[in-house]
């Protein structure tokens, strides 16, 4: 895979092997094939969902910067038929397509506000019924699936010896999911539905002709991703991502379906899962009712960019406790970044440092100046398992040195940093009119101190806290981050 020598290669934790591995395109065309599970469009996505989508967005941006936009193919699906969408149609008394179209539009608007690039392809489950039926018939022909007495079709888990490799779940430990109510129709309680026979009292008018020998009905949840990946990306993809809640059973089932239908071909060469967002120490979810939507937060006066920034403040593979205090800190940080960029933009061209790039024949950026050490540190942090808190720490180290420093980044390099993080600085919203203005120097020191704490560099963390105190501010640690308050 051709790459620039400007920064270290992108490496990412692989949930299957439990190791850090470099990302690489596997096909001869050099195109990196990347899939992430999208939303179920029956209600607004909450910011816990968007944490995962923002993580995927940063991955997409880094890959495009590294390989070129034409060498990345990103697919994200929309689940527009499943138990929850159908339940919502019964609840509202409206057609399925009308409800899912409404929430799809809302999801797209929120993604745009949060700065997420749209996928290259966004297939829907209802738009790929034929592909799902074809895959189910393939599995039935190969003996991996069977028709139950009620006309449904189930995947026979014991036909796939590698089942559980991703989640490390053994057969005796398999969860009995909410499909257990249909266990009378299964060969084994752990088998999962590929096709659900039509039930008039539950499904209303939602049904399609089934696979050969099966009843009319609708696809199960898991088969859609396998079918859409095969159609739009092929039998083997380079990266599959999603939230940790999808690791089992959804992603485990995808592997089983795809590899059985495709003759054992590796389904995904790399798996990455982001962790839960917490509220008051509890996982944020619609079922618990303890969630924020983007609209909830913008109604309180916070900008979408502040939400994005706050969600970047914790490592994607670690749980992050979300608070409104973190949004206040994010708004202030964004203001500091705006001011810094304005100073860079105002510098005469003659003041810009002259640097020579280290290049190789494979580099696509041979004519660009070499990045400053600060910019290099930031990208290396992102390339090292998406270490976003370390990247933000490196960003504010740059800012703290000042726009006039001899090693200040060029405006082009700073804009490349902003692109990688997906931070749009064009909007400026003051959500804390009564709060005293925090000096840029204090904010920068606080970001550095937080990064030092995360790195367990206690000596540096204590020294930075003392510097903050000397400037008249108290930095108070919280589970999810920190707050800054003027000292009395």
Regions from the language model: what does each represent?
Residues 78-81, 104-107, 117-132, 150-159:
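Short, glycine/charge-rich beta-strand/loop segments that flank catalytic centers
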Residues 118, 148-150, 477-481:
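Short Gly/Ser/Thr- and Asp/Glu-enriched loop/turn motifs at secondary-structure junctions
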Residues 17, 22, 27-115, 484:
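N-terminal, positively charged nucleic-acid-binding surface of large information/translation enzymes
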Residues 2-42, 53, 57, 71, ...:
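Alpha-helical recognition segments enriched in aromatics with Gly/Pro capping
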Residues 70, 95, 117, 236, ...:
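Short coil/loop linkers at secondary-structure junctions
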Residues 283, 291-488:
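Structural preference for alpha-helix termini/caps and helix-kink/transition segments
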Residues 89-96, 120-126, 243:
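The substrate-binding groove and active-site-proximal loops of carbohydrate-active enzymes
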């Amino acid at each position: 895979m051709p790459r620039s020598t400007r920064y270290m290669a992108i490496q990412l934790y692989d949930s299957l092997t439990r190791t850090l591995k470099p990302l690489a395109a596997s096909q001869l065309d050099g195109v990196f094939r990347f899939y992430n599970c999208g939303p179920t469009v029956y209600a607004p996505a909450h910011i816990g969902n968007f944490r995962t989508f923002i993580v995927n967005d940063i991955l997409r941006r880094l890959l495009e910067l590294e390989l070129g936009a034409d060498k990345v193919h990103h697919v994200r699906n929309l689940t527009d038929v499943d138990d929850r969408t159908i339940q919502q149609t019964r609840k509202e008394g409206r057609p399925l397509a009308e409800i899912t179209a409404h929430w799809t539009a809302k999801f797209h608007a929120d993604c745009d506000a949060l700065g997420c690039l749209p996928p290259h392809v966004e297939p829907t489950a209802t738009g790929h019924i034929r592909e799902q039926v074809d895959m189910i018939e393939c599995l039935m022909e190969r003996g991996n699936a069977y028709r139950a007495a009620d006309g449904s079709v189930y995947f026979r888990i014991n036909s796939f010896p590698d089942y559980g490799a991703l989640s490390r779940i053994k057969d005796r430990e398999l969860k009995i999911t909410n499909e257990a109510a249909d266990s009378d129709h299964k060969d084994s309680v752990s088998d999962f539905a590929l096709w659900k026979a039509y039930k008039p009292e539950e499904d209303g008018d939602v049904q399609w002709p089934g696979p050969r020998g099966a009843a009319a009905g609708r696809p199960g949840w898991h088969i859609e991703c396998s079918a859409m990946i095969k159609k739009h990306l092929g039998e083997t993809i380079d990266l599959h991502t999603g939230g940790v809640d999808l690791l089992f059973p959804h992603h485990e089932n995808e592997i089983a379906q795809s590899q059985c239908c495709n003759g054992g071909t590796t389904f995904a060469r790399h798996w990455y899962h982001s962790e839960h967002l917490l509220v008051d120490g509890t996982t944020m979810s619609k079922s618990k009712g303890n969630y924020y939507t983007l609209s909830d937060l913008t109604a309180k006066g916070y900008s979408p960019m502040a939400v994005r920034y706050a969600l970047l403040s914790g490592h994607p593979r670690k749980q992050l406790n979300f608070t409104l205090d973190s949004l206040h800190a994010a708004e202030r940080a964004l203001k500091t970044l705006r001011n810094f960029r304005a100073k860079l933009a105002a510098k005469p061209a003659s003041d810009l440092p002259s640097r020579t790039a280290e290049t190789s024949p494979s580099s696509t950026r041979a004519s660009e100046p070499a990045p400053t050490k600060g910019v290099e540190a930031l990208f290396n942090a992102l390339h090292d398992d998406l270490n976003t808190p370390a990247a933000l720490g490196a960003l504010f180290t740059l800012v703290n040195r000042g726009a006039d420093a001899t090693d200040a980044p060029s405006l082009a390099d700073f804009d490349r940093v902003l692109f990688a993080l997906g931070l749009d600085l064009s909007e400026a919203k003051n959500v804390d009119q009564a709060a005293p203005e925090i000096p840029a120097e204090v904010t920068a020191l606080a970001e550095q101190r937080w990064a030092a704490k995360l790195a367990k560099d206690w000596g540096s963390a204590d020294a930075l806290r003392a510097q903050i105190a000397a400037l008249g501010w108290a930095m108070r640690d919280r589970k999810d981050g920190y707050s800054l308050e003027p000292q009395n």
